[in-house]
């Protein structure tokens, strides 16, 4: 039996852990540069706020309906997610982390009442992290996702499904007749993997509910759509077509990019931003145990600013040897900026992509800056470089991100750090769990 554990309105719930005043009130989390609503509380959904809706379209609800908006705090959300996933892992022998707020658990070999076990797990997550969750249980991944949908909607919309299925729904424990009733009450577009385009085509073919899909001919679906939809159908019938991936394959490319909070015109500003993005990408590279053989750097003006002169810079730099060293990757990215930068332009976005990724275990060509390497051979291999990067990562985890960093990541003006390119986050809450200086203070 598989379970899909999902935090309810993850980003909003994280904010509510440290700001109880937000509970029961309409809340939205805004995207980078505070442009669009990327998360909504149930109360905000009830006001009609749509996912990805531009903030300016609903800003009037602040005054008329008491809507509260906060800027995205991804550092906080990521840390809270890690804590939640660690708790879930205690309850099952295998876990696949699917996204920042979802994971699959495999209960094969686990004895006892799984609903009771999941109830204990939900209580532990709430007690230790403060996040509300829903759990869906089923014999396949797709059925577990469907069960999670039922568990959520039963709680959020009373009457949508039987109340007893709220919070924790085990479709493996309901009879066939009741399962078909649940299928009949669910639009086909709510099924995992069935997107808008496929939903439209299915509706045109007379398939509007999940029950309609389950009763369809598998071979016909494969012919008219794809083998993927056929597998979805089989999974809904209880035939497992997707195995649990408890050791997901590493990404083949790692991209970090941002739109700037305001236009950047100086080469130093672009170098600073690109250095930051390269450092973030290097962290992700080491986390998955890889090295990069090439670095792609780009920065561009905004095509939406018609009165501005337009310029787009893009280059890929092959590296002498694959590396996961932040210094080497930042150096390559910064060098590319100096070669491509042109004065007189209002740059609006930049990014760094690490390419040609390889297993670090198969590539140990690393340079130790503090080792016995001749200055004339900067690319000479040394195992010390990997140890230095591991120490850097450890210090940053312990004392907060960027406690140890490459100098070009942050510009300095009159002794003070400045980031002209930083995204607009006028409403960001403190990073309570990862920054000592932002930790909540209790006064006795």
For each of these PLM feature ranges, what is it?
Residues 138-140, 300, 353-357, 409:
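Short loop/turn motifs enriched for small/polar and acidic residues
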Residues 334-398, 405:
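C-terminal hydrophobic structural anchor segments
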Residues 190, 198-347, 361, 440-444:
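DNA-contacting surface of Y-family translesion DNA polymerases
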Residues 9-10, 34-36, 302-305, 357-361:
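Short, charged/polar surface micro-motifs in flexible loops or helix N-caps
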Residues 111-114, 154, 306, 359-364:
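Short, charged/polar, Gly/Pro-enriched secondary-structure boundary elements
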Residues 2, 102, 132-134, 294-296, ...:
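Broad gene-expression machinery/nucleic-acid interaction feature
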Residues 103-108, 313-320, 365-373:
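Short, hydrophobic beta-strand segments
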Residues 1-234, 243-244, 376-444:
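Gly/Gly-Pro- and Ser/Thr-rich, intrinsically disordered tail segments characteristic of DNA damage-repair
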């Amino acid at each position: 039996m598989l379970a899909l554990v999902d935090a309810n309105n993850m980003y909003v719930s994280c904010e509510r852990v440290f700001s109880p005043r937000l509970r029961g009130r309409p809340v939205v989390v805004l995207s980078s540069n505070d442009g669009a609503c990327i998360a909504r509380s149930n109360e905000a959904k009830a006001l009609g706020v749509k996912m990805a809706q531009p903030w300016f379209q609903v800003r009037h609800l602040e005054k008329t309906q008491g809507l509260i908006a906060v800027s995205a705090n991804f550092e906080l959300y990521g840390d809270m997610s890690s804590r939640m996933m660690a708790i879930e892992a205690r309850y099952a022998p295998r876990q696949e982390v699917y996204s920042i707020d979802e994971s699959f658990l495999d209960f094969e070999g686990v004895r006892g009442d799984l609903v009771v076990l999941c109830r204990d797990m939900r209580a532990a997550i709430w007690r230790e992290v403060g996040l509300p969750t829903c759990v869906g249980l089923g014999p396949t991944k797709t059925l577990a996702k469907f069960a999670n949908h039922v568990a959520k909607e039963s709680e959020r919309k009373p009457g949508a499904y039987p109340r007893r299925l709220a919070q924790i729904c085990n479709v493996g424990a309901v009879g066939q007749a009741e399962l078909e009733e649940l299928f009949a009450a669910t639009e086909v577009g709510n099924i995992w993997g069935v997107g808008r385009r496929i939903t439209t085509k299915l509706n045109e073919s007379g398939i509007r509910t999940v029950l309609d899909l389950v009763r369809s001919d598998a071979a016909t679906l494969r012919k008219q759509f794809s083998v993927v939809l056929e597998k979805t159908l089989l999974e809904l019938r209880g035939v497992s077509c997707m195995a649990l991936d408890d050791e997901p394959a590493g990404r083949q490319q790692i991209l970090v990019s941002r739109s700037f909070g305001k236009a950047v015109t100086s080469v130093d500003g672009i170098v600073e931003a690109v250095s930051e993005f390269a450092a973030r990408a290097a962290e992700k590279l080491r986390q998955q145990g890889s090295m990069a053989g090439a670095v792609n750097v780009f920065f561009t003006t905004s095509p939406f600013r018609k009165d501005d002169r337009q310029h787009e810079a893009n280059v890929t730099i092959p590296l002498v040897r694959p590396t996961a060293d932040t210094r080497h990757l930042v150096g390559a990215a910064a060098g590319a900026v100096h070669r491509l930068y042109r004065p007189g332009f209002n740059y609006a976005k930049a990014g760094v992509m690490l390419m040609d990724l390889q297993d670090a275990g198969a590539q140990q060509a690393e340079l130790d800056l503090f080792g016995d390497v001749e200055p004339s051979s900067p690319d000479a291999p040394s195992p010390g470089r990997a140890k230095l990067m591991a120490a850097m990562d450890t210090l940053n985890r312990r004392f907060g991100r960027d406690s140890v960093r490459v100098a070009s990541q942050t510009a300095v003006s009159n002794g003070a750090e400045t980031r002209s390119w930083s995204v607009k986050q006028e409403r960001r809450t403190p990073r309570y769990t990862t920054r000592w200086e932002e930790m909540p203070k209790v006064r006795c």
